[in-house]
Amino acid sequence: MNTLSFVHLTDLHLVAPGQSLYGLDPAERLRAAVHSICRRHGPDAAAPAAFAVITGDLAHLGEVAAYESLADIIKGLPFPCHLLLGNHDEREAFLSVFGGVPTTPEGHVQQALSTPAGLFVMLDTNEAGTHAGKLGEERLARLSATLEYSTDPVFLFLHHPPVASGIVGMDRIPLLDADALWQTLKPHRQRI
């Protein structure tokens, strides 16, 4: 298997400019992270990254202004950034800013990215009306077809953990169809 460096971030919880969250400015913290990432993983670094994946809770309240701030900040990355939705995200507001991201025909933000190291599968677990996650039959069917089509190693990304994390707050909002996900993955478990 080929090696590949990438950056993974999650739970940015950005708010509209000028607002704070628990006394902190999430955008300021993300700018500092991007600066560090560019220094450590930019094209001239010892370990340059091919891309970044941010696995959800991009915005705390799902505000358009927070997504606009995110778009502005990640422009500073010297490589592509793949975004997923989390339980705090609002699909319509997100897509109003990031309309060019890969989506399914049903509007779910997910994709399969072929890399020299394998297939990076990014799943949308955002479910309207709940903080819990769900894939549903359509997304699971797409995942199954993707896994059947490819024989490459698979790297799976999603916001909601498919197992109990031991963190009470997270375990209260589980991936509701985790068992169905495990059944979908089972025939391919040696590659994941």
What are these model-derived regions, one by one?
Residues 20-30, 60, 132-140, 171-175:
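Flexible, glycine- and charge-enriched loops at secondary-structure boundaries
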Residues 1-69, 73, 165:
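N-terminal active-site segment of His-dependent metallophosphoesterases
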Residues 64-149, 175-191:
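Extended active-site neighborhood of metal-dependent phosphoesterases/phosphodiesterases
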Residues 3-16, 117-127, 155-159:
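Active-site-proximal beta-strand elements of phosphoester/diester hydrolases
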Residues 18, 152-192:
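Active-site-proximal segments of metal-dependent phosphoesterases and phosphodiesterases across multiple
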Residues 11, 52, 57, 70, ...:
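Divalent metal-coordination and catalytic microenvironments
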Residues 3, 48-50, 79, 152-153, ...:
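Short coil/turn segments at beta-strand junctions that form active-site/ligand-binding loops
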Residues 15-20, 92-94, 129-132, 164-168:
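A short acidic, helix-capping loop that chelates divalent metal ions and anchors anionic groups
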